[in-house]
């Protein structure tokens, strides 16, 4: 929850001198009031209705930061044989945002170049959620022969395994499931093949069957009923910067930055929207999915998602949309002092929220997706094993 008021704190800074016998010579310690918690937000207003039962979203931003002054003790020897003991001193809290790459002094988020990829990914993926189902008849027709051949082998194996299990013949069950020793001649190829059949045969088929059933059995939507889709994509940005006006210290930032797209829309042309959701209006989508090795490209650069997003808004009208950035920022720094022994620890924390509105569907742009996720890696290993064993 975002605070609604600032908080100041009274800090005591130690500066004590001792002679060579350890006797107190002077105490120049002082106290100073500094801001600990700073918050800022945009002014709000009550939005009006742009259509019956739908209230217009508004632009809004809000943010705060908590700045903990340095904690640590420093010592140094004096020319007369004495010594001094001191704290680091007061650091201007505004240096936290001055060194930050994503947060301004007024607590407004500046996404920066780091955010371009996650922004474009979120906009494409929210457009792909506009379809009422994942059913793609166009591709299914083109793949009918391959799918039938792929599933025939699995169907026979599973039916035989099921029949053997009912009769208590567990050796036959293991044999049909490729677990018995005499059927395990090429485990890498067999396991890879079964894994690929699961990923590209069974799972898409079951998804299409469920989507077809849902589409055919769902009740008809009322005319101009507001619908909504949402998608959030985030990333972590870690970096170090040399402190401005510093004596050589380095500040380490850890930012968690995310963007959320939310779109309210209605179906203006049911026939066009229906055809679009079935994948019948975009021949590029079918052509790409049938291109050899296109799935390898999609691991790094999801061209298929981009092509699909281009036609998904067909037959739909947007009512309104919002793009919301959220930022969580943490700072850690170790502060030295020239001529002194010792270090001080500096920590700070900030959180910010920034929502903007739009009234047209976002334009899909290419983005890069990490190929090192667990599912992508498993698919890659299975495909490599398949190719090597041929």
UniProtKB/Swiss-Prot annotation:
Listed A to Z, the keywords are: Host-virus interaction, RNA-binding, Viral attachment to host cell, Viral attachment to host cell pilus, Viral genome circularization, Viral penetration into host cytoplasm, Virion, Virus entry into host cell
Q: Which residues form a coiled coil?
A: none
Protein modification: During internalization, MP is proteolytically cleaved into two fragments allowing translation and replication to start.
Q: Which GO terms describe its biological process?
A: viral genome circularization; virion attachment to host cell pilus
What GO molecular function annotation could you give as one example from this UniProt entry? RNA binding
At the top level of its lineage, which domain of life is listed?
Viruses
Q: Which InterPro entries match?
A: A_protein
One GO cellular component, as annotated:
virion component
Q: In which compartments does the protein localize?
A: Virion
Query: Whom does it interact with, and what assembly results?
Result: Interacts with the host pilus.
Q: Which family does it belong to?
A: Belongs to the Leviviricetes maturation protein family.
Functional description taken from the UniProt entry: The maturation protein is required for the typical attachment of the phage to the side of the bacterial F-pili. Binds to sequences located toward each end of the genome, hence circularizing it. The RNA genome-maturation protein A complex is released from the capsid upon host receptor binding. Maturation protein A enters the cell along with the viral RNA.
Q: What is this protein called?
A: Maturation protein A
Species whose genome carries this gene? Enterobacteria phage GA
């Amino acid at each position: 929850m975002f605070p609604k008021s600032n908080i100041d704190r009274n800090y005591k800074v130690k500066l004590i001198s001792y002679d060579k016998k350890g006797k107190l010579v002077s105490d120049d310690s002082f106290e100073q009031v500094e801001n600990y918690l700073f918050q800022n937000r945009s002014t709000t207003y009550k939005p009006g209705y742009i259509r019956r039962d739908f209230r217009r979203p508004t632009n809004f931003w809000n943010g705060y930061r908590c700045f903990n002054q340095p904690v640590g003790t420093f010592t140094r020897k004096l020319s007369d044989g004495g010594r001094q003991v001191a704290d680091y001193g007061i650091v201007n809290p505004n240096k936290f945002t001055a060194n930050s790459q994503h947060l301004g002094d007024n607590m407004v988020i500046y996404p920066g170049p780091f955010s371009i990829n996650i922004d474009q990914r979120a906009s494409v993926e929210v457009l792909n959620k506009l379809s009422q189902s994942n059913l793609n008849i166009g591709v299914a027709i083109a793949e009918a022969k391959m799918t039938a051949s792929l599933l025939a082998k699995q169907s026979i194996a599973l039916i035989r395994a099921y029949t053997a299990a009912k009769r208590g013949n567990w050796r036959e069950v293991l044999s049909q499931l490729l677990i018995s020793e005499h059927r395990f001649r090429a485990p890498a190829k067999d396991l890879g093949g079964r894994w690929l059949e699961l990923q590209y045969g069974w799972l898409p088929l079951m998804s299409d069957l469920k989507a077809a059933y849902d589409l055919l059995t769902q009740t008809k939507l009322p005319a101009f009923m507001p619908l909504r889709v949402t998608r959030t994509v985030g990333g972590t940005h870690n970096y170090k910067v040399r402190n401005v006006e510093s004596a050589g210290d380095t500040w380490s930032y850890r930012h968690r930055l995310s963007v959320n797209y939310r779109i309210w829309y209605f179906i203006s042309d049911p026939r066009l929207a229906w055809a679009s959701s079935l994948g019948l209006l975009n021949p590029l989508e079918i052509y790409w999915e049938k291109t050899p090795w296109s799935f390898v490209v999609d691991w790094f650069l999801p061209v298929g998602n981009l092509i699909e997003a281009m036609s998904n808004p067909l037959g739909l009208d947007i009512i309104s949309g919002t793009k919301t950035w959220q930022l969580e920022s943490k700072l850690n720094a170790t502060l030295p002092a020239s001529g002194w022994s010792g270090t001080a620890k500096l920590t700070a924390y900030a959180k910010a929220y920034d929502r903007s509105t739009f009234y047209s569907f976002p334009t899909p742009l290419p983005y890069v997706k990490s190929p090192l996720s667990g599912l992508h890696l498993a698919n890659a290993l299975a495909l490599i094993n398949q190719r090597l064993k041929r």
